[in-house]
UniProtKB/Swiss-Prot annotation:
It comes from the Eukaryota. Its main location: plastid. One of its GO terms (cellular component) is chloroplast. Keywords: Chloroplast, mRNA processing, Plastid, RNA-binding, tRNA processing. This is Maturase K. Transmembrane segments: none annotated. GO terms for biological process: mRNA processing; RNA splicing; tRNA processing. The lineage of its organism: Eukaryota, Viridiplantae, Streptophyta, Embryophyta, Tracheophyta. It comes from Alpinia calcarata. Pfam families: Intron_maturas2, MatK_N. The keyword Repeat does not apply. GO terms for molecular function: RNA binding.
Amino acid sequence: MEELQGYLEEYRSRQQQFLYPLLFQEYIYVFAYDHGLNSSIFYEPQNSLGYDNKFSSVLVKRLIIRMYQKNYWIYSVNDIYQNIFVGHNNYFYFHFFSQILSEGFAVIVEIPFSLQLISSLEEKEIPKSHNLQSSHSIFPFLEDKLLHLNYLSDILIPYPAHMEILVQMLQSWIQDALSLHLLQFLLHEYYNWNSLIIPNKSIYVFSKDNKRLFCFLYNLYIYEYEFLLVFPCKQSSFLRLISSGVLLERIHFYVKIEHLGVCRIFCQKTLWIFKDPFIHYIRYQGKSILGSRGTHFLMKKWKYHLVHFWQYYFHFWSQPYRIDTKKLSNYSFYFLGYFSSVQMNSSMVRNQMLENSFLMDTLTKKLDTRIPIIPLIRSLSKAQFCTVSGYPISKPIWTDLADCDIINRFGRICRKLSHYHSGSSKKQSLYRMKYILRLSCARTLARKHKSSARSFLQRLSSGLLEEFFTEEEQVISLIFPKRTSFYLYGSYRERIWYLDIIRINDLVNSLLVTT
């Protein structure tokens, strides 16, 4: 990033902050290859063109040479439209070059945002904490904050209706008109190609072929969406100490906020419209949660605010059913693979004062997290480890592997699933998942050797069992070697949140998506 920052500073001085000339530099595509994180086009095999999944500098140089040609893209697109139903060679060839260009373009537009993030962290002196990157790091926050809230809104973030909205958002950040025209060209042509080749396809087709660029545009859209939510929260916390008498006129609301921010007229009056000092916001995988300690009427105001701002700011109709508001004490919400709810635990305490004794019923709140067994079985069934009803079956595609490789694969999947779902307060679902994977492993081995699954379970009972141990269970088995099975199948009930889960396993990810 430091080297890339040096290139950017050089081009800023020469080209007056133009990003477009960077597309003609080969090192940009090298950066796209190095930092692709398995989402770059250079990692994906192009069987239709005969290329492998290695980075090809020859293709990049050929692309740069063709971009220097005048009106190359216009002539290529016209040629594709004329011959689209005659042959697909020109289409796939040009489509491949467009994907490479989109990868390089994604790297370029990320540069200003990356530099701004680095400078912001340095100014605020925020230390880099890798533990906060874990998906489990949010659950201790929920255990601490969620118990004091009354209502919860489950929000389904809508997708932008038109790609031109994304370009308009980027225009406020990047002043390079040529880069914006190139982005419009890529989005427009991909939409036309997909409508010709694969009709009735949405923006999802574009995201499959251009993961990095679409991820950047989607994150930009999410940033604008969250700004509409964070702005009233910041203003409400600030305006609680500011006179709100002049804010009763809603016509020039935001202009008056700016003037009030300078005047700082302290008063006991409060802004009643958005006042909510106990509001919390969490976003995950296209969804978000808005928790509040206020009343149901206040949550309706937030819903009204979000729906109308989506309509007027993003220019598309947003259905009110995308925001579901429930009372937290009577509501179980799905969050990152867990069904979470706030439970009231009753405990009897005996108090004695002098000669009199009496019992007191004490109620305490506790965040309960459980694994939904039906989506878990559905995910295992989709991966062909069991049937839809949860009956374990063999994995025929793995029968060509060695026995140790088969056992290691099943054990690795089981440990990763157990590692991610270790925060469940009820372990029955985990035990059933381990049973399905263990029996599926035995039946896969039996199918390979044309034997019975019972014989493999008897022959490899101890070794096969150890492969499905999780980390915490391995520690317990070392401390209590004679009581391993007892701890494995019923005694170990503590919730554990790990701070090293940076990337989610594919099977876990499919579980999160299917639910």
